[in-house]
Amino acid sequence: MVSPVLALFSAFLCHVAIAGRICPKPDDLPFATVVPLKTSYDPGEQIVYSCKPGYVSRGGMRRFTCPLTGMWPINTLRCVPRVCPFAGILENGIVRYTSFEYPKNISFACNPGFFLNGTSSSKCTEEGKWSPDIPACARITCPPPPVPKFALLKDYRPSAGNNSLYQDTVVFKCLPHFAMIGNDTVMCTEQGNWTRLPECLEVKCPFPPRPENGYVNYPAKPVLLYKDKATFGCHETYKLDGPEEAECTKTGTWSFLPTCRESCKLPVKKATVLYQGMRVKIQEQFKNGMMHGDKIHFYCKNKEKKCSYTVEAHCRDGTIEIPSCFKEHSSLAFWKTDASELTPC
């Protein structure tokens, strides 16, 4: 028969042994939480693992009881990110992504000519949904362009009802005698507005001066405006240096103001020369002088080789320099051969 004292002592030792086998704080699992979370647990106490928001369990146990051994069983629970649905194809745009898992972001961009109607990025939420919603790519349009003062639409073809699409162009022109400052063509931009509009300004030019030894004609009106024209001419024996017609430009000046150049009096009475590739006689072709800008070739003699060569002479505003090698042939020296009749060197 066991002594009551011995039995009580044995029970005490057993209680101490059992009470001493507590479980430690459980291992941390990626993306999971433990309830209740303590530093130690008595045998028989339970814990429950839960995946954090945005994550779901893939295999393994979630509920555990602290055993008498004081050692937690091996935990094979896996918490993995939620996966949001495929974002789909963004019509007229592109979706950029690396993953559809929580908490990844995806971004959106539209093709040229389209703009994002919605957000530029979306996030995979804890619930496995995209937020904000997936956007759409809408066409970029520009409203009808404002017409500048004193301007008209020269070429306007809206391609979206009354609106124009991205990169559509409009061409303007100014009313007569108004000068356009800027580009006559504007374009619908990616911001949905037009590039800078031109201006149409009234431009006046002063009356063109009459060239010395010449004349000028222009419209008989109080003011000469942009695109008005003036014509010039010279008196006899003078030649116009420059175009016969000038135009009032958008800067308020004339495109050109020509001058009248004096003709050249040839100090040679008689000679055969080359003019425009033909042999002509000075006394016949240039009896009234040689016009400014004209050029002729005089024949010169190479006495050693008994042949001829030509030297150019140019009339410049009443002045011409006769080549020093040229010798005017005298009709009295009939036995001498004129240089123009010799064989070319």
Curated annotation (Swiss-Prot):
Cellular-component GO terms for this entry: cell surface; chylomicron; extracellular space; high-density lipoprotein particle; very-low-density lipoprotein particle
Leader sequence residues: 1-19
Tissues with expression: Expressed by the liver and secreted in plasma.
Primary location class: secreted
Annotated keywords: Disulfide bond, Glycoprotein, Heparin-binding, Repeat, Secreted, Signal, Sushi
Biological processes, Gene Ontology terms: blood coagulation, intrinsic pathway; negative regulation of angiogenesis; negative regulation of blood coagulation; negative regulation of endothelial cell migration; negative regulation of endothelial cell proliferation; negative regulation of fibrinolysis; negative regulation of myeloid cell apoptotic process; negative regulation of smooth muscle cell apoptotic process
Stretch list, region Sushi-like: 263-345
Highest taxon above the source species: Eukaryota
Matching InterPro entries: Compl-Cell_Adhes-Reg, Sushi/SCR/CCP_sf, Sushi_2, Sushi_SCR_CCP_dom
Intracellular or extracellular location(s): Secreted
Domain Sushi positions: 21-81, 82-139, 140-202, 203-262
GO molecular function, one term: heparin binding
Positions bearing carbohydrate: 33, 105, 117, 162, 183, 193
Cystine bridges: 23-66, 51-79, 84-124, 110-137, 142-188, 174-200, 205-248, 234-260, 264-315, 300-325, 307-345
Function (record text): Binds to various kinds of negatively charged substances such as heparin, phospholipids, and dextran sulfate. May prevent activation of the intrinsic blood coagulation cascade by binding to phospholipids on the surface of damaged cells.
Name used for this protein in its record: Beta-2-glycoprotein 1
Organism listed in the record: Mus musculus
